[in-house]
Amino acid sequence: MKNKVFFLLHGLFLCFLFLIPFQGIEAQRKRKNIKVETKEVSLDAFKFRNVGPAFLSGRIADIVTHPDNDNVWYVAVGSGGVWKTENAGTTWSPIFDDQSTYSTGCITLDPSNPSTVWVGSGENVGGRHVAYGDGIFKSTDDGKSWKNMGLKNSEHISEIIVHPTNSDVVWVAAQGPLWSKGGERGLFKTLNGGITWKQVLGNKEWTGVTDIMLDPRDPNVIYAATWDRHRTVAALMGGGPGTAIYRSDNGGDSWNILSVGLPNNPDSNNDGIVNNDDSPIINMGKIGLAISPQQPDVIYAAIELERTQGGVYRSSNRGESWTKMSNTVSGGTGPHYYQELYASPHEFDRLYLMNVRVLTSGDGGKTFNQLPERDKHSDNHAIVFKDDDPNYIMLGTDAGIYESFDNAKTWRYIKNLPLTQFYKVAVNNAEPFYHIFGGTQDNGSAGGPSATDEREGIANKHWYKTLFADGHQSATDPVYNNIVYAETQQGGLHRIDLTTGEQVSIQPQASF
């Protein structure tokens, strides 16, 4: 009897095992026939919150002050929109956050109606970290609201000038795309306040306009500098046969090239290697222009040549002929990143050349000295003067805004303008609140908590610098939360111990 029961149970068990695969197959068939309901979740469900830091500022592209109230400033930021202050930097408001681009290259106010603000989006420098823009923007209510006025394919806009007495006439210098040919390049003009645009200079696929200026005596006289520019991942082609200086005497309807005394650009009907007289072609790079407010027949040009060489040139006859004054040229990462030239409104032949450190000349460009910059960040891009104060200078740098009231002897730093451009971020596994780390453009690397248990939340005091120079990518140790890795430019790699503050270079070295 026991054996019968045993064999019966054993047989039932084998049947059960035999049926299991078929049950699985049947279950799979049923699952295939079931329609799974899916829901689309909008990204609007995820709300961003500001975690800082606010103790670092960032790269300034352009600054303009209100002509009737010099406490009102508008600031175009390379990677942070447009900001406005009405109390000389005590407090700030971001006024461009709802627009289609965060990169801005230039800003100007209508001289006839300063409530009208024009912004050119897309910063006009040649670095790999530069974002492209979305054309021209216009505000008629002091920056409260904006309207896109076209030129969306320009990507990088270098200058906007509004006619001094006719608000409908505006000129826009568009450098054009950095990484590709074509787009909207050259000098564009509108006669109807930006409703329509006409290209009046430049028609080459690589040639844009990098600087323009008007004769203060006659707005029909316009000077423009064109620039051949193209970047790849590996290299920057920062010059070419299309680079030149032009003048128009009829508001941009026709142009004359101004080349007498300048480096020898190609003339017509040549083979691209030598000119017709067998002299070698010397291609020019980025050009910065300035006009003397005291004697507007005097024009200055800072010209980049091949292999980061160059010079400053001066004309006393509206550009008909030029004299080389010196070999001075912007340095650092190259003139493509600087090269803006300014003439002082207070002193004839006083020039300021934007550079790693500002270079200034009091003799029309013959000699240059470094502007005193004690306790001030380097890498300068924009300058502002006051008509009624010869000792006042405001500078826009890679680390924000500085102003001097004593002709650069001392500097006031505008600390409360949070504009830092982060390349990449990383997080550690710290508890109860993980920390965030990132490398920034020219403001080192930094870290800070994702939250705190303090009533005030995250404040500047909770953030800290981890490394110096140009940061890029940070990384964290998955086990030891106080170990962080950070980078500097040109391949520098460091290990940082947050407990001791020790920084050790661990950049791999070549073996010989």
Name every feature range the model reports, one short phrase each.
Residues A27-F512:
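Beta-propeller blade termini and top-face loops
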Residues P21, E26-A27:
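Boundary at the C-terminal end of the N-terminal hydrophobic targeting segment
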Residues M1-L12:
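Bacterial N-terminal signal peptides that target proteins for export
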Residues H10-P21:
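Bacterial N-terminal signal peptides
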